[in-house]
A protein has these predicted regions:
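Residue-level signal for inorganic ion chemistry
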Residues: 20, 24, 47, 58, ...
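Oxyanion/phosphate-interacting regions
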Residues: 1-11, 15, 171-178, 191-274
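A short, compositionally biased
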Residues: 29, 100, 128-132, 222, ...
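Glycine-rich active-site/cofactor-binding loop and its immediate structural neighborhood
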Residues: 78-122
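N-terminal subdomain of lithium-sensitive/metallo-dependent phosphomonoesterases centered on the IMPase/IPPase/PAP
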Residues: 1-87, 249, 265-274
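Residue-level detector of anion-binding/catalytic polar loops
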Residues: 23, 64-66, 140, 182, ...
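Conserved beta-strand termini and adjacent loop/short-helix elements that scaffold enzyme active sites
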Residues: 37, 70, 186-188, 231
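Acidic beta-strand-loop-alpha-helix segment within the catalytic core
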Residues: 105-193, 240-274
Length: 274
């Protein structure tokens, strides 16, 4: 396939995400093999099966494109790069908590061009193409109009090294939990970003994310009219692991609070990941 327009890339991302989502849904109640990649970082046989399904589909349409996937790593190619998380929310999935998703994004030299996030247990497909807006199951979606931090519902997550380095994620959680209306921790960063884009959450922040966690979701937020930045307010790029996404009416308040906290702990921006 030679068509690399954002609209076509979006359609391929959507179809690939749905394909992987069906694999996950079919295996959800069955037996599964669970392995530990780190202290609290899991991988299941369903992750690998879903990844094989979506990568095979992408390669059918764009055999020359590069791919970065959570389980199989990077494969070189020319032109665009697909960034795939076949199962975001693996711990939820392993415990049969039905809150997880597939995330498929594709980026060019100037950033993400298209992306899709599919939550199979709810049959919700969030997608976006650059310059064409964001949708939920085909209907346009927008970030919330919330402008007061005290009226906001925020969400966050914890990186896999939170046991060794809790000061950032736990400290910022403490700072916001007493200022927001409510706080949630769902276990899927990609879905958290999709929920910000859909106006369900007013803001999201997290440390230590990988490109496959944020590629598709960042475009959803931006195309839905939201703010997507590094956690200190600097410009966002896919390789940045410490991020903040929110409704535009909350951006200055959240960034100000975040900067104050980061200064207190002596935070140093990590180098962007490839």
């Amino acid at each position: 396939m030679s068509d690399e327009s954002p609209a076509t890339l979006r359609r391929i991302a959507e179809e690939g995400a749905r394909l992987a989502g069906r694999v996950l849904a079919e295996r959800f109640q069955g037996e599964r093999t669970i392995e530990y990649k780190g202290g609290i970082d899991l991988v299941t046989d369903a992750d690998r099966a879903a990844e094989a399904a979506v990568l095979g589909f992408i390669r059918q349409h764009y055999p020359g494109h590069a791919i970065l996937a959570e389980e199989s790593g990077a494969s070189k190619g020319s032109g665009l790069r697909w960034i795939v998380d076949p199962l975001d929310g693996t711990t939820n999935y392993a415990h049969r908590v039905p809150h997880f998703c597939v995330s498929v994004g594709v980026e060019g030299p100037d950033g993400v061009l298209a992306g899709a996030i599919y939550a199979p247990m709810m049959d919700e497909l969030f997608s976006a193409a650059r310059g064409e807006g964001a949708t939920l199951n085909g209907r346009p979606m927008r970030v919330s109009g919330t402008t007061e931090l005290g009226h906001s519902l925020l969400c966050t997550g914890f990186p896999y090294d939170v046991h060794e380095r809790p000061e950032g994620p736990v400290g910022l959680l403490k700072r916001f939990i007493v200022r927001a209306q409510g706080m949630r921790r769902t276990g899927s960063a990609a879905l958290d970003l999709a929920y910000v884009a859909a106006g369900r959450f007013d803001g999201f922040f997290e440390f230590g994310l990988k490109p496959w966690d944020v590629a598709a979701g960042s475009l959803l937020v931006q195309e839905a009219g939201g703010t997507m930045v590094r956690i200190d307010g600097a410009p966002f790029q896919v390789g940045i692991g410490d991020v903040l996404a929110c409704a535009p009416g909350l951006a200055s308040q959240l960034i100000s609070e975040s900067r104050g906290f980061l200064a207190d702990i002596g935070w140093v921006p990590p180098a962007p990941r490839a």
